[in-house]
Amino acid sequence: VCLSLTVMSVDPDCSPEITAMIGASIALSISDIPWNGPIAGVFVGLVDGKFVMNPTREEREKSLLELTVASSEKKVVMIEAGAKEVSDDDMYEAIMKAHEVNCETVKFINSIVAEIGKPKFEYPSCDVDHDLFEQIREYATDAVKAALDTDDKKVRDDRLQVVYADVFEHFGEIYPEMSDETVAMINECMYKLQKLVVRRWLLDEQKRVDGRRMDQMRPLNAEVSLLPRTHGSGMFTRGQTQVLTTATLGPISDQQLLDGIDDQEYKRYMHHYNMPGYSVGEAKSSRGPGRREIGHGALAERALEPVIPSVEEFPYAIRLVSEVISSNGSTSQASICGSTLALMDAGVPIKAPVAGISCGLITKPDSDEFLTMVDIQGV
């Protein structure tokens, strides 16, 4: 599915991102393409202690909160936020109010669909072969459990390779003329089996693959001043995830000029994120930044922005670069922690240290019950 969203005209008081989100939802909803929408989006600000839905440009400049919420009629599907140390209660209330507004927009979209929407086309199911899955589950469950049960990702991957090889050897005897379709189906069944094992550990035993509790973080380590010629540097390690962030200071003339659809503006605090192939054991060439690098860089930049001193207090341009040395989940959050270390090492008088951590949510089938976990890692 390809959606083309083109900004034809801009009203400074109306966010083009929200308009594009709702427009995309309408386009999919009235088409014959099956999907689980519609969804709607809204921007929430906090101005003078009151929540403002889709604030004007002037209100956004005063707002303590920049929150974008996308949701269906029943559930939230996406949250993006930046805030000047807003309380947990205020953030929760803002999300709930945003969902109420989105529900009204979804009703509006449904009324459009009722008038001009096309019937959704039918397509063949891509579910795994149930009989084959049951055979694999019976044969390989114990081996998969033993392979997954370790806190070392490399060891886990090596064990799983052995299990996969054994499964293919065993079922190669049952299906001697194994087609490409059968190979793909066995791989899909093995993935489904791993998912089933992990979900049962989480939901039934509150156990994670590395043995941690749901609220337990991996071992932490932090170092500063690792690089002798940089203005500041910080290495943050959480489990097998490791990020090295450097801080470079320059004259205010080094700030970045932003020339987008809004008025020209300057950015004196910049954060860039790089994740080379070696961090995940891949041999790949270094190209320009992709969506991951741009998105993670912006996320970590936004996390530190509220604590950066004003230009009157600290008249310098600040550039941070986070290099992912080793990745096993939560590299964006590690780059936030590394950025705090590098800024303090460079002598930047930030208002408060900032840390980041990833959180996950898992729900029970056909139930509203759920469990949350902190510090997600790769499996």
Regions found by a protein language model. Name each.
Residues V1, N36-P38, T105-Y123, K154-V155, ...:
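Flexible, glycine/charged-enriched surface loops at secondary-structure junctions
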Residues V1, V7, C14, E73, ...:
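Glycine-rich, flexible beta-strand/loop modules in the N-terminal catalytic cores of phosphate-handling
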Residues C14-I33, E223-A247, N328-I350:
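Conserved phosphate/anionic-ligand binding catalytic regions in large, soluble enzymes, centered on
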Residues T19-S31, A94, V101-T105, H170, ...:
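Stable alpha-helical structural segments in soluble proteins, enriched in small hydrophobic residues
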Residues D32-D151, L343-V379:
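Mobile "lid/hinge" segments at catalytic clefts and subdomain interfaces of large enzymes
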Residues F121-D263:
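Extended amphipathic alpha-helical scaffolds
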Residues S285-P289, E293-V379:
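Conserved structured catalytic cores and adjacent interaction surfaces
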